[in-house]
């Protein structure tokens, strides 16, 4: 029996196939792992792009906390400083205005009370106010005798003080009359040589003569009061009383005439005021059309204020004259002994003093306004 020879070439292809299969499996595994890695990377990239889209859709908010707080604090500090500075500025302006008003009123009060007329008016108001109080005390059931006697003594002293303040007006009026007479005589020699003595009566002011006689009677009453207070009683006491009653009657009559003449003067002031108001209205409408009237009517600066103050002064002067006429009628008729007449006299006299004080205050305003405009 013959044995077959061993074929060695058969086993070699089987080994190569196995090696190829193993390498193919390894390649497939590597490819699968690589492909799976690529999928995971692509998913992560897709998710990242989606998140970017979502973020892009959201509104962009820029926040800078430190800078915003700093600017807000700066704004708050700036507004606080501005408000405090405005308040302090307003306070300083208000204090300056208050000081100006105080100084202005103080100057006006000095102008009123430093004059003899202002002191006389204030003493008049005080005298008749105390007189009214003494009359009201008489109606009380419980009478204060000591207080009433002291009150009457104060009233007498105030009346005497008023006579002291008016003392010397007769000499001033007499000097004015003599000066006026000399001026008229010189005018007659220069321009009116052919005129008669009636020239003096036409151009002489009747008010000055009446005022001079009134001041003369006023000073005679003062001398009589001083004599009765400090002098000794003599045998001619009855004759002096008769003479002084006559002087007092003439004193009241002359005061009534002066008030009537003052009404005439007040009417002339009203006419002049109306002219000035018309002139001012024309001047405000057409200033170029009144150049020919500037020499005839001269108004000071700050015309509206001055005209208003002048109007108030003329009105107060008119009220004062009316009250003086009413109070003096009670003196002329001699009815001050009655209670009602005396009460009316005291009330009217207080009203007259108040109106005269207001007139002096307005006059002080006019002078201060004129000084201010002249300074400007």
From Swiss-Prot:
Major localisation:
membrane
**GO annotation, biological process:** peroxisome fission; peroxisome organization; regulation of peroxisome size
The membrane topology of this protein is:
Peripheral membrane protein
Where in the cell?
A: Peroxisome membrane
Q: What GO CC terms are in its UniProt record? A: peroxisomal membrane; peroxisome
Keyword list (alphabetical) reads: Membrane, Peroxisome, Peroxisome biogenesis
Q: How does it assemble?
A: Homooligomer. Interacts with PEX25 and PEX34.
Q: State the remark under miscellaneous.
A: Present with 382 molecules/cell in log phase SD medium.
Reported function: Required for regulation of peroxisome size and number. Also promotes peroxisome division and biogenesis.
Could you tell me what this protein is called? Peroxisomal membrane protein PEX27
Q: Which organism is it from?
A: Saccharomyces cerevisiae (strain ATCC 204508 / S288c)
